[in-house]
Amino acid sequence: MKFGYFDDRNKEYVITTPQTPLPWINYLGSEDFFSLVSNTAGGYSFYRDARMRRLTRYRYNNSPLDMDGHRIYINDGGTIWNPGWQPAKTELDSYTCRHGLGYTILQGEKNGIAAAQELFVPRGDACEIDRLTLENKTTAPRTLDVFSYVEFCLWDAMDDSSNFQRNFSTGEVEVVESAIYHKTEYRERRNHYAVFWANTPVTSFDTSRDAFCGVYGGPAAPEAVKAGHCSNSIVHGWAPVGAHHFHLTLAPGEKKSIIFGLGYIENPVREKFSAPGIINKARAEAMMARYATDAQVDAARRALADYWQELLSGWQLTSGEEKLDRMVSLWNQYQCMVTFNMSRSASYYESGIGRGMGFRDSCQDLLGFVHMIPSRARERILDIAATQFEDGSAYHQYQPLTKKGN
């Protein structure tokens, strides 16, 4: 069975069915912020360290697979579907997933409504941008209820998945207009928080998983999506989430976009609060302003494309064999850069919780990307050397955030 094909012109792998043998994932990010996204919009996000700065939860051994992720729901008169098929699993009239260089685009269509979900991590910012574009392809107006959904991790992914007696009482959020701030432990233990925002005024929102999904519900059919609205819940403890709801009407042939962002904000200790007990949102507000319009998002995508074009231009093969040229000139180099960023420390099989960066593996990985980005190779060599002891021994593996072994 054929599941997709290479689009050499656009430098993409195009997946033509959501039901691949296993989730097929792309790695977004090239600096400090990373997201894993599958061909059905599953995955998770983290800042630098998949254990110690995890923004969103992921259940690796869940059944069914790949239910956690970067979710968009569309309720069209009671028909609930996702642009990437999961988790609702409503049969789509058409589906494609385009895994590109640092971005993924999911395109789904159902009953004359087309939805494109475009995800990427921009250069120079610690955030993921998730742009949804809706189009009414029919000759009649269509009214839709559109929802976003992410489930926040309480930062330390190891503790988050084990210390439940404590974690069920620590979750804390704040909502300002269309921005949902996840600020668990910010007051006393941390100087960083996450923000999940939209550039469009919300109709309603939720921050409680129980309110959005239902105590006995789940991401396949959340109670809020079935009801057509959220309940404006403010969670205290339990499971904090971010969910936006928009009630939209599209005229025949009309297109509308909503820009979502998931960002990581770290404040200097002296600048943690803008007033007693009020988190300093200045950096978050500046980040949101940088991606408030389609023109700004388009510019960020072009900058990302230019970055990859420059990286790949130094080594190109013309052998007369199309498949060999494609592997050497594009996908092998892309994979080497992903390996440089991750060092196998985070995937759908390596949870990022226990392994960290391998000393030997990271040394070997240098051979694959040093020609593309020698300055970053030098940084990696110094990082690896910094974990060695005076007698020449070293940690077998270490956490990328702290450089401490585990």
Give short role names for the model-derived ranges.
Residues A386-H396:
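Short, mixed-charge aromatic SLiMs
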